[in-house]
A protein has these predicted regions:
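N-terminal [4Fe-4S]-dependent radical SAM core
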Residues: 1-2, 54-55, 64-103, 107-137
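A short, structured N-terminal alpha-helical element that caps or precedes a catalytic domain
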Residues: 1-67, 72-74
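Core AdoMet radical
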Residues: 5, 10, 46-49, 114-211, ...
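Charged phosphate-binding loop/patch that engages nucleotide di/tri-phosphates or the phosphate backbone
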Residues: 13-15, 23, 123, 285, ...
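Short, charged, surface-exposed secondary-structure boundary motifs
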Residues: 15, 43-45, 57, 74-82, ...
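Short amphipathic alpha-helical segment that frequently serves as the phosphate-/nucleotide-binding helix
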Residues: 15-23, 152-156, 183, 209-212, ...
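Short, well-ordered alpha-helix to beta-strand connector turns
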Residues: 29, 41-43, 61-63, 96-98, ...
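A structural motif corresponding to the C-terminal lobe/cap of the Radical SAM core domain
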Residues: 189-196, 203-296
């Protein structure tokens, strides 16, 4: 069979589902490639979409086309077990690190997050060696690995193996703040670049400060602490959180709120604040009030 794959979001970040589908089909002797509607015919095409705001692919194929992913608001379709737990085909994107989940789900019920709707409660998913494939670096996509005993055991294993990792979706600062043993464990991890957390609301302030304090106490410098900062309607509140993190020596990254159930887009002010925060030369050289005056 000839299999075509379409990464609807683009190729800026490897699509894990497509890498697993590629590995499974290649094991069956099928030919797999990123689909080109002008180049050849396919027996089957898979289109995967992670983000609702990504423009859908309008290419037409004269074969069975499977569309799936959170970006299609499809929360029910999952990969069969034999595909879900296959080692991904990393050659598809030519990446140098492994990708995967140790756990799935989350214990939190954040109104802005799709994970509770799609995955439910946190649970064990895979051992790091299932998808490591000899790599010494791994990007882990867990949504709340610290809420899982299995997840904590896997982090211990990662430390023993000496693997460099990036928990790309962020770690829960509240669990770090309230469990000093977790802070001590994370300080033993080799990070690819940053230890990522989130500062989504002012209600998290005490926990965020405590997490930073504990991690610094165990030897993780503030400059290695990266925080996703959610920007909702109150941009002044988000600006305050961003400035707070900057003063502490941490790395804020602003994310304008998107309603995953509707088509609403972030406001101009949300975009402007995020642009200023995320362009680090600008962020470190110009105060936001000065920048805002120039961009009105």
């Amino acid at each position: 069979m000839r299999i075509g794959l379409v990464d609807v979001d683009g190729h800026n970040f490897p699509n894990l589902a497509l890498m697993k589908l590629s590995a499974w089909h290649k094991c069956r002797g099928d030919t797999v490639e990123f689909a080109d509607p002008a180049a050849r015919r396919y027996d089957k095409v898979y289109m995967s979409k992670v983000f609702t705001f990504s423009r859908d692919c309008t290419d037409r194929y004269d074969c069975e086309v499977v569309r799936a992913g959170t970006g299609y608001r499809d929360y029910a379709t999952i990969l069969p077990e034999e595909i879900e737990h296959i080692c991904p085909d990393y050659s598809l994107y030519g990446v140098k690190e492994a990708y995967g989940f140790l756990t799935r789900g989350c214990v939190n019920r954040c109104s802005w997050c799709v994970v509770p709707h799609k995955e439910g409660e946190v649970r064990a998913h895979a051992d790091i060696e299932e998808f490591l494939d000899g790599h010494k670096h791994a990007v882990l996509l867990d949504n709340n690995v610290l809420a899982s005993e299995w997840g904590l055991m896997q982090i211990e294993k990662i430390v023993r193996m000496g693997i460099r990792v990036d928990f790309n979706q962020g770690l829960d600062a509240r669990r770090i703040a309230r469990t000093p043993e977790i802070a001590a464990l994370l300080a033993r991890v080799k990070w690819i670049r940053f230890l990522r957390m989130a500062y989504d609301s002012r209600a998290m302030q005490d926990d965020v400060h405590k997490a930073i304090e504990l991690l610094r106490k165990h030897g993780v410098p503030a400059r290695r602490l990266f925080f996703y900062v959610l920007i909702r309607d109150d941009t002044e509140d988000a600006l305050g959180r961003i400035r707070e993190l900057k003063a502490l020596g941490c790395q804020p990254f602003a994310q304008p709120y998107r309603d995953f159930e509707h088509e609403g887009k972030p406001s101009w002010e949300q975009w402007r604040l995020a642009y200023w925060c995320n362009r680090k030369p600008l962020f470190h050289s110009v105060d936001y009030e000065e920048y805002r005056k120039k961009r009105t």
